[in-house]
């Protein structure tokens, strides 16, 4: 009986040790395993797509209680890249992104609302063009696991819509649609 109890404890020990809890992650911008893309109507007719090349951030993901997770992302708005240098310079002007006066954007979550096993709404505050407003990211869990370099990663994707007038932008091309692809390395 004693041997059976010891065997049962040894078998159960690894399971207990692997129980997931909150973990901190750094967004992998070095390996380009993350992206912030956008699309907006080009003169109200077709889609103009692009991305922000410079951003950084971190998140805490609690696998057992995703509602306790947290996200912080900082974006260098002047790193806007629409694959056309002259247009990118124009987009940075005061009439558009106003990057000289407000070169960065900041998002910080305030809560996470779990909507299904692998989706949720990340509620937070977005500071853009010097204006801070409540802002939601509609997120989906993509996956997690060991990487080939001895680390551990978690990945998510999210969408959001920016209403330019909410952030004192004057351009009239409609809403800006964001797609975020985030892979983090556990710290």
Where would I find each of the regions flagged by the language model?
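Low-complexity, acidic/polar, glycine-enriched regions of mature
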Residues: 20-187
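Short, basic/polar N-terminal leader/transit segment immediately after the initiator methionine
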Residues: 3-6, 24-25
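Conserved short hydrophobic patches within well-ordered secondary structure
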Residues: 6-7, 184
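Positively charged n-region of N-terminal signal peptides that target proteins for export
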Residues: 1-4, 18
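Bacterial N-terminal signal peptides
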Residues: 7-16
